[in-house]
Amino acid sequence: MSLEVWREITAEYNGKIIKSSFKFIDGKVDVRTQHGSKTDQLGGRTPEQVAKTLLRELAREGRA
């Protein structure tokens, strides 16, 4: 059994700072908020870059 480590991430969206948590396991980044979640692969980016992108997408969808 592996330990999941969640880290805090912040991003700016429409002039507001939004916060969430993300984990990076097996080449995938998972971002979760109280209202939703998104997962994506690195694709040459750092886990932090992917997490910020996913968090902004969740905010755009009204789920952050």
Residue ranges and their predicted role:
Residues 36-64:
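Mixed-charge, Lys/Arg-enriched low-complexity segments
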Residues 2-34:
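N-terminal acidic leader/helix
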